[in-house]
Structure formats: structure tokens, C-alpha cells
Amino acid sequence: MKKHITFALLFAAALTAQAQQGGISGEMLNQIKQSYKATPADKAIRNALGGTSINTLALNQENRADFDTEFSHKVLSKGITDQQSSGRCWLFTGLNVLRSQMIAKYGLDEMEFSQNYCFFYDQLEKANLFLQGIIDTSGKPMDDKMVEWLFKHPLSDGGQFTGVSDIIEKYGLVPKSAMVETFSSENTGKMSNLIGLKLKEFGLQLREAAAAGVKPVELEKKKTEMLGTVYRMLVLTLGEPVSTFTWSLKGGEAKEYTPISFYREFLGNDLTNNYVMLMNDPSREFYKCYEIDFDRHRYDGKNWTYVNLPIEDIKEIAIASIKDSTMMYFSCDVGKFLDSKRGLLDPDNYDYESLMGTTFGMDKKQRIQTFSSGSSHAMTLMAVDLDKAGKSKKWTVENSWGSASGYRGHLIMTDKWFDEYMFRVVAEKKYVPAKVLDILKQKPIRLPAWDPMFADEE
């Protein structure tokens, strides 16, 4: 008995020693402290940072000269939209691409589609996507990875281009005057929180019913009743979507439309089949087709599918599109090195290395692998400045943060920033080389919904 006790004590002591070896010991702490040699410059920096933001002190004064705002190729843009305090950048961007086409086609002075109309059905469809996902996984335990992901993401106001195609192809479009913004459409946080909370409650009820042996047809009835509750919550916060409306083109004779007839008459794009998403993700193999599981806005919609390309290939496609006066859906890691006052995206905007006395040496691939960078915001790519050799020098996007933000509502990015923090564009297939389109014929490599590279754009 004593032998066993002695062994147990020795084993416990060994584990404790092993744990201590991985911690910060007193000796190690002394070494760390001694490695820091305070200098007069350090004291000045500490004093400054005590009452000033890091970005203010890291601002690179050598990069403060006025930057060139002229571009060799630019798509006509009329009016800046504002998503306010919402994560609907993906929707504003998609609609801005379409309104540019309508303005050019009909010579309009202005045009804006109702973001609120599309957003209403986006939220309803996402609610159904969640509830049906819960039914489909009802036989799996709560700690299953997919079940866990569903309950963590019942719905959000963010998204990407597949949401634009999913919603418009099914529900059409209306002018902004037919369904205007509300407080909750412009400030989505509380509404999304309440609907998400209710959906999680409904999700548990559906799992309990399935576990009790309720038949699929009865689960469908329960889901329909639940969606009725969500519909009411959406009507109270966003208003009820119009089914018909009257509208005239350039002061002509007014005509009655449905959202679908309006879309088909004035645009009629096949958003599902005429566009292709292109990604620059150096952490994965190029010239391959990828599909993100369950990453769609409708249960009966299409999973997000894209072709992964080197950055130079994407630039060639983007340049071809802009030269032909066609805007593009574009997404990037907008918060990196953004000088919001000037509306300039440039890795040379801030010199964090000189301020902190160290280097930040990860490349794009390493930043993706370590969850340090990823697409966070969608905007409309609408201009490029080319040198005499036809190579890009800088780019411009039309943003959806209002006309007072950035450079007159736009952001200008250097080509270097484009290389490092641009992640995807959506191009019309007519601008994409045949060899790239052929990649779409491959069986896509399926990635899980929780892959960190594919969070919603907000």
C-alpha cells in the first residue's frame, strides 16, 4: 500500500514539475525583464502612447503627400450608398453593381434599388436554412461539429455574392422608393439578436420533436409555424415587402410591376450562371475549384463555389471588366492599413515596425493560416490606373459607408495593398479566360462551413 502511495506522489510531482517547465518561472521572468533595455526614445514613446492611439503615432509621415486621384480607366458611378450600422455590405455591393448596369443602359441620372426589400427575404431564407439544417442534423449529438456551428450561426446580416444571386433570382428587385429603409434595417444588431435567440429556441424544439419520433411531415409543419413567427418579427422591424408597385422610367408613363417582372424587364441577368467568383488564397492550391458546404443564403440555393487563382490572373480579369465599363463585386480585408480620413489603403500608411522596434514578417499565406487576415468587407471595384505597359498602379472601389467617408465615398488602394489584402472578385464570365472557366467543370473540393476563410462579409 505504501509503495503505491509513494509511486503516486512521485508521479504527481513529476507532472507538476513538467507543468512548471512550461510556465514562466521566476528565473525566466528575470531574464525577460533584463532583456528590456529602456532608452530615452522608449520613454518618449511610452509617454506618447499613454494618451495617443497607436495608429496616430505609427502614421508614416513620408507617405502623407497628396496621392494621385486620376485613373486611366473608370466605370461611371452616380451616388454613394450607405449601409449605416449594419453588416449588409455584400448586399449593397451586389446592388451597386446592378444599378450601374441599369444607369448605363437607360441613361439614368440616378437609381437605387431597395436594400431593405432584399434584406427582408434574406433574413427569412436564412431562418429557414437554419431550421431545416437543424432538422437534417437532428440525429446527431449537440456536440457534433455541424450542429454546434448551426447553433452558433442561426442567422446574420452579413453574407457574400451567392446571397445576392440567391435572393434576387427568387424574389426579384424593387426601387428604393417602393420599400424604404427602417431603423432596424440600418441598425440590425438588436433585431438580428432577437431573431437569432428565437431560432435557437425553435432549433431545440425541433430536435426534441425529432428525438420523440415526430414524422418529417409534422416537423415541416412545425417549421412553417416557426417561420410565421420570424415573418412577423421581420414585418414589425423592416415592414412588409411589396408584391406590386407602380414605377416610371425617366418620367415616362407609370406602369405596375411585380418585383420579378421589374427585375426581368430592366436587368434580367442570370446571376447564378453568368458570374464566377475568383479567389486569391495562397494557402490553398491554385487553379482548383472549391465549394463551401452550407454557405448559401437559401436552403434551395447554391453553395458558394469559386476558382482559386494567382493574383496576377485576377488582375487581368478585373482590368478587362473595368475597361469594358463593368463594375465588379470585390471583397478584401479592409481594416488593414486603412487611412480612413484620406480614404487610402496602402501598406505604407503606418510604420508599426519602427514604432514597436520589431518586424511583422508574415506573408499573405501565413496570415491566412494563422487567422490574421481574411475577407471582411465587400465593395464595388470600379476603376484602375494603368501604366504605359498596361500594368496596374492603383485601384478604386465604391464603398457603402456614405459620401462623407473615405475619398468622396470611395477608397483608393495601391497595387501593393491589392496584392496583400484583396481576396475575391466576382466577374462576368465573358471576361474570364476559357482555361479558367474550364476549372469550374472540375468536381469542387468541398470545404466545411466553419472554415475561417469564409466568414460573412459585413
Spans of features found by a protein language model:
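Second-shell loop/turn segments in exported
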Residues: 75-87, 149-155, 301-308, 317-318, ...
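Stable alpha-helical elements in mature extracytoplasmic
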Residues: 85, 93-94, 98, 160-169, ...
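Post-signal peptide N-terminal segment of secreted/secretory-pathway proteins
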Residues: 65-137
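Structural recognition of the beta-strand scaffold that forms the well-ordered cores
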Residues: 91, 117-120, 166, 175-178, ...
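Active-site signature of cysteine proteases
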Residues: 213-458
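N-terminal regions that are enriched for targeting/export leaders
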Residues: 21-79
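Bacterial Sec-dependent N-terminal signal peptides
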Residues: 1-22
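Papain-like cysteine protease catalytic cores
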Residues: 115-245
